[in-house]
């Protein structure tokens, strides 16, 4: 059984709704790991996300919120793309469907083609194999304090449904790991 404690950064009013009604799936055609309910492995990443959301003009007057969840599924329903063999398996399963006739053109074109392709590939693979939780550590380059580029990663989880969330609670932004929210 796969069980993991994960974090979701959002706005306070949305956190209240989530705790009452459950999460809504993110369904944009450019989602990083396909459609799903998104979580970060690291609390600090979820806090950064929540604080960025608050700074958006459309969210003026809102407050950040941090949710901690325990997600779960059977081992064979969890797929970790950090494992190179799993990534190769996903690519080889999807690749035959990317060719349009004899012309060899990708089915998806346009400015967000690669993002849409990744989303579509993840959705296809999850559906094909009954995957309920998909994980990947997205790399990015960041300069350290003295200017050296360093590769860091941000692990994310896309969970199919609220049924895969077995515990949920709100934590205080900036609080300690096991601190409850002050609200």
Language model region names:
Residues 25-26, 54-66:
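Cytochrome P450 catalytic domain signature, combining two hallmark sequence patches
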Residues 27-53:
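Extended catalytic/binding region for NAD+/ADP-ribose chemistry, centered on the ART fold
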Residues 4, 34-36, 64-68:
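Extracellular structured ligand-interaction cores
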Residues 28-31, 57-60, 148-149, 158:
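A general structural signal for short secondary-structure junctions and capping/turn motifs
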Residues 1-32:
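ADP-ribose/NAD+-binding catalytic cleft of ART/PARP-like enzymes
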Residues 9, 65-183:
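Active-site and NAD+-binding cores of ADP-ribose-processing enzymes
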Residues 7-13, 39-44, 70-75:
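Short, flexible loop/turn elements at secondary-structure junctions
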Residues 16-20, 48-52, 89-96:
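Charged/polar, solvent-exposed surface patches and flexible loops
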């Amino acid at each position: 059984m796969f069980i993991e404690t994960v974090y979701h950064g959002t706005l306070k009013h949305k956190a209240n709704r989530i705790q009452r009604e459950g999460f809504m799936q993110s369904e944009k055609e450019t989602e990083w790991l396909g459609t799903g309910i998104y979580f970060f492995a690291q609390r600090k990443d979820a806090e950064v996300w929540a604080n960025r959301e608050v700074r958006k003009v459309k969210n003026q007057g809102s407050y950040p919120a941090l949710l901690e969840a325990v997600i779960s599924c059977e081992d064979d329903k969890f797929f970790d793309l950090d494992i190179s063999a799993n990534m190769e398996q996903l690519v080889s399963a999807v690749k035959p469907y990317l060719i349009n006739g004899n012309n060899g053109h990708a089915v998806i074109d346009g400015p967000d083609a690669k993002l849409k392709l990744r989303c579509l590939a993840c959705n296809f693979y999850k559906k094909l194999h009954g995957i309920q939780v998909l994980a990947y550590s997205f790399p990015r380059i960041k300069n350290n304090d003295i200017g050296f580029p360093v590769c860091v990663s941000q692990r994310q989880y896309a969970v199919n449904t609220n049924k895969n969330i077995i515990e949920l609670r709100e934590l205080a932004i900036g609080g300690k790991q096991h601190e409850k929210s002050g609200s």
